[in-house]
Amino acid sequence: EFVFVIGASGSGKSTLIKMLYREEKPDKGSIIIGGINVAKLKNRKVYVLRRKLGVVFQDFKLLPKLTVYENVAFAMEVLGYDKKEIRKRVLEVLDLVGLKNKVRQYPDQLSGGEQQRVVIARAIVNKPKLLICDEPTGNLDPDTSMEIMKVLEQINAMGTTIIMATHDRDIVDRMKKRVVILDHGRLARDIEKGGYYNERA
């Protein structure tokens, strides 16, 4: 499934995203991801949840002294994969996001759109079932934003659920995916194939 989370500033989008990957804990209620109740997860077990997730932020959070390849490989190295498996998978995901020819470059040698592709590659290299995106096109121009959305659609088509918080009306209106509208921390609407303006209907 591909779900957009929209709403005015202060509606709770970022808080919801942070709760999904347990940056914040909900005051009440449950959040179930892959059979894990995130709300009741002990701090020492948060890593178990995060291994099942990929997260893409608006600000790229790339390691500046590592190459494109090394930035993506790092996500597998910390989990103890062997070098042969890492190389195979990293090259696969860099090919998927259109960066196979940029493996030796550093983040400051890339455009904003290319840096975001590296972030996406790093987020999916461990084959997460859920990819959480917090304003992934917020720092990009409209054309580059649509290129990033095509990459996310490809990933979604391969079986990964995507939850994306955004303010970008054009993207939401064009893509006609499920739209969840938040208002002051509450669910205002849930539309199967919606647009940014559906809440006015």
For the regions a language model picked out, list residue spans one by one.
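A short, proline-enriched helix->beta-strand linker immediately N-terminal to the Walker B motif
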Residues: V125-K129
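Short coil-to-helix segment of the ABC ATPase nucleotide-binding domain corresponding to the Q-loop/switch region
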Residues: L66-F74
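Conserved ABC ATPase signature
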Residues: Q105-L110, E114-Q116
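Conserved ABC transporter NBD signature motif
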Residues: G29-N37, L49
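Helix N-cap at the start of a conserved alpha-helix in ABC-type nucleotide-binding domains
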Residues: P142-T144
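Catalytic Walker B motif of ABC-type/P-loop ATPase nucleotide-binding domains
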Residues: L131-D134
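Helix-to-loop junction immediately C-terminal to a conserved catalytic motif
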Residues: Y21
